[in-house]
């Protein structure tokens, strides 16, 4: 049978990252293309204990329907966490709802703010999951080039003047996926001013902010939001576990009201059992000690990968030096064929993600690849960098 596919989905393709991971599911392939937290980062025993307690003490509440906005004790815990830990006080103008993972925040923000043909600006490169979300709403997706301290402000101003119906700017200010770049405080203040003057919303995605292993923490854009133009999205995926699928968003109340309606249509509410797990975990864990442990795991793994790259790779290959997060960005020399390099890497049993997957314009030229240091073992990092190093020295 010939099935009719909607215009909205006919042009959509699977994430290149997912396709690469599928193609390299062979356990002998070293997964530099992945983006998962380190397996030893999960507080498994705590989760087992908390879930057992919840099901023993409050089984019906955990398994029953609930309200779309989120489990009330978790919402209150998140308000307190945002104020005390993230420096984001709950202003009178704002409200908070629980999400089924941070990805739902991108979907709901786009659904609420954008009509077909409206413009969404994003860092170029940017997170492929969000890019595909924006594309699914048939917006005009425009990338703004990145610099070593965040998005290019002259290019942002030029895009705001050039493009029509710009509804929002999507940013990952901390340890950006895929580059590992962090937006400086000065640049955050200035891009906030630019967007406020232009009347453009900022969608601030902060899944990696707690994974800082060097340097000083930088205030979020939401903490500066006196004009009500920032939608902030947080997540438990990198600090607890991605499998719980719990995130949250703080946004102006009129937008939260519409996002709640959109969420009702999408999934009714986030799973109550995992919301209860997150609330009790926040109440019982030593969060600062837990985060310090995660930061040390990723500090060591990142340092190992950087050391191996500097030792093994051709000096013509450059890379970012992240202060946190899970990723770094390697750029091949002028004239290099990035896709050929990625295919040769797979032949050497090492998977990296071609940088073109992260561009707003998938046909634009790109000489970079994303490398992940959180998923592979230390031994795999060393072996994988040795294999890629030989390849870079042969080619460049």
Predicted segments with their positions:
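PLP-dependent enzyme catalytic core of the Aspartate aminotransferase-like
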Residues: 1, 347, 362-396
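Conserved PLP cofactor-binding pocket of PLP-dependent enzymes
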Residues: 29, 207, 346-370
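Conserved core of the PLP fold type I
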Residues: 61-198, 203, 209-227, 298, ...
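Conserved PLP-binding catalytic core of the aspartate aminotransferase-like
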Residues: 316-349
């Amino acid at each position: 049978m010939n099935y009719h596919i909607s215009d909205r989905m006919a042009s959509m393709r699977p994430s290149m990252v997912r396709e690469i991971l599928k193609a390299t599911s062979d356990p002998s392939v070293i997964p530099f293309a992945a983006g998962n937290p380190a397996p030893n980062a999960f507080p498994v025993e705590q989760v087992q204990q908390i879930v057992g307690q919840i099901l023993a003490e409050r089984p019906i509440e955990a398994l029953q329907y609930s309200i779309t906005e989120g489990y009330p004790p978790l919402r209150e815990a998140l308000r307190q966490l945002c104020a005390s830990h993230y420096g984001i006080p709950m202003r009178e103008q704002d409200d908070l709802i629980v999400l089924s993972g941070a990805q739902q925040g991108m979907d709901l923000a786009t659904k609420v703010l954008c009509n077909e043909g409206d413009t969404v600006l994003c860092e170029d490169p940017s997170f492929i999951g969000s890019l595909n979300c924006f594309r699914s709403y048939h917006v005009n997706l425009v990338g703004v080039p990145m610099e070593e301290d965040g998005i290019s402000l002259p290019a942002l101003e030029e895009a705001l003047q050039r493009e029509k119906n710009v509804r929002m700017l999507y940013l990952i200010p901390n340890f950006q996926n895929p580059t590992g770049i962090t937006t400086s405080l000065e640049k955050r203040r200035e891009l906030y001013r630019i967007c406020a003057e232009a009347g453009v919303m900022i969608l601030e995605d902060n899944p990696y902010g707690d994974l800082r292993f060097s340097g000083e923490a930088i205030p979020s854009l939401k903490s500066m939001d006196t004009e009500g133009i920032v939608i902030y999205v947080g997540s438990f995926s990198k600090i607890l576990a991605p499998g719980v699928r719990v995130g949250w968003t703080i946004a102006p109340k009129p937008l939260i009201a519409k996002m709640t309606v959109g969420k009702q249509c999408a999934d009714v509410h986030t799973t109550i059992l995992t919301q209860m797990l997150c609330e009790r975990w926040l109440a019982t864990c030593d969060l600062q000690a837990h985060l310090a442990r995660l930061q040390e795991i990723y500090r060591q793994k990142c340092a190992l990968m950087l050391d191996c790259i500097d030792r093994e790779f051709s000096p013509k290959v450059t890379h970012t030096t992240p202060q946190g997060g899970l990723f770094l960005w390697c750029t091949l020399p002028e004239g290099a064929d990035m896709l050929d390099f990625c295919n040769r890497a797979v032949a050497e049993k090492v998977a990296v993600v071609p940088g073109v997957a992260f561009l707003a314009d998938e046909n634009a030229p790109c000489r970079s690849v994303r490398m992940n240091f959180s998923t592979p073992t230390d031994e795999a990092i060393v072996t994988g960098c040795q294999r890629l190093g030989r390849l870079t020295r042969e080619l460049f």
